[in-house]
């Protein structure tokens, strides 16, 4: 077996069909891989200490031989098992004992994205699909959904896969069983998934932005950027021209990208190698051929995009640039953006009442995401705090200080956040919520924010921190924010404009 980097589709498919394959992890990704390998008739060893019982019905779909092992048993017997390939769930670190042991035995280790892409490109499920890959520190889900909408509006059989929902391996297996085929996979891919996919080469790839994140997993920011950069091996790379770290990463890898995007005028930011840039001119989203102003294509209005603000506009520009790389018609881009509504917890307006807008951006779980959520806004009552996980907030406060009218802080690391706000913005009103019960805390947040807000203000939940200190996840945090916004803003009348959550 060749090295993981050199693993080719035909070789990988032959291994999946005729050799023993070990699957590490039984989460969403692991279950998707199992269903795909079952469709291929693989000999499987599933390693999982949890959720193994949920997999029994999957093996009934074919003649697959499936053996279940605990992690410790798999480590002890790995040499005896002699798998020719290990497919790991994305969260498993390279130094995990099982994966480290596989490396010692020179067994190739790949992830769920790589396994699905290799099988698909080898023709295991019919004509290979077109893959578009979206990654970045923030904005991946919104951009993936926007891009999928544009492709569908253009008449393409497109499906959003990866972190946004269905695992691509599960989608391949489902279509193998007779469900409608998708010819285009729009994949939201994480740095973890890309680490385990060194051979992955999508048709179109884009890094939306880069900031320090998941350093405990990757070991350094350089490693994190290197894993993200895997999408830039695409046949057509799209560069985020407003993000210096993305451009630095691309230059370090000598990426030649003919396409890019910006939220500014395309001619003002285009790099020397970029030929076509999507950007904003005269209130319109346009695609410009650099150096030839006569070749400007109008795409859509730059106003009214969901989510509002620069972050939403950047996602729309990225989506449009990737769509244009596949030849999507301008009318389809405009129609998709006109009908697009951001998913819950990603800049969703949950209430407009009394001239005050309440915005749920609970997904902003790190300082970079919070900065993106608040950039360009004014008169903001900022709801922030939770688990900072060691992240510094001084740069964030410096960047968004001009947008803030007041701060309501909660969560286990609220003191650190409040201290930095007080140091940089000593005159800014700050309310500290000491409650640790999730409902009580968010009830107090909404009460305080309602008391501070005046017509023309926005109350924005953009925590800059993880949620697990009090909440089951960012979804519960956002749901409770919306619930108590309605309660304290007095929006129980029938004519209130509360947007449907979903």
From Swiss-Prot:
Which InterPro entries does the UniProt entry name for this protein? Answer: Folylpolyglutamate_synth_CS (IPR018109), Mur-like_cat_sf (IPR036565), Mur_ligase_C (IPR004101), Mur_ligase_C_dom_sf (IPR036615), Mur_ligase_cen (IPR013221), MurD (IPR005762)
Q: Which GO terms describe its cellular component?
A: cytoplasm
Q: Does the keyword Ligase apply?
A: yes
EC primary class: ligase
Residues annotated to bind ATP = 136-142
| Major subcellular location class | cytoplasm
UniProt keywords (A-Z) are: ATP-binding, Cell cycle, Cell division, Cell shape, Cell wall biogenesis/degradation, Cytoplasm, Ligase, Nucleotide-binding, Peptidoglycan synthesis
Reactions catalysed, as given in the entry: UDP-N-acetyl-alpha-D-muramoyl-L-alanine + D-glutamate + ATP = UDP-N-acetyl-alpha-D-muramoyl-L-alanyl-D-glutamate + ADP + phosphate + H(+)
User: Would I find Cell cycle among this entry's keywords?
Assistant: yes
Q: Where in the cell is it found?
A: Cytoplasm
**Coiled-coil spans in chain:** none
Kindly give the Gene3D superfamilies that the UniProt entry links to this protein.
Mur ligase, C-terminal domain (3.90.190.20), Mur-like, catalytic domain (3.40.1190.10), NAD(P)-binding Rossmann-like Domain (3.40.50.720)
Q: Name its GO BP terms in alphabetical order.
A: cell division; cell wall organization; peptidoglycan biosynthetic process; regulation of cell shape
Source organism superkingdom: Bacteria
Q: What would be an example GO MF term here?
A: ATP binding
E.C. no:
6.3.2.9
Q: What does this protein do?
A: Cell wall formation. Catalyzes the addition of glutamate to the nucleotide precursor UDP-N-acetylmuramoyl-L-alanine (UMA).
Against HAMAP family, the record matches this protein to: MurD
The entry sums up its family as follows: Belongs to the MurCDEF family.
Q: What is this protein called?
A: UDP-N-acetylmuramoylalanine--D-glutamate ligase
State the species of origin. Answer: Corynebacterium jeikeium (strain K411)
Q: Which gene encodes it?
A: murD
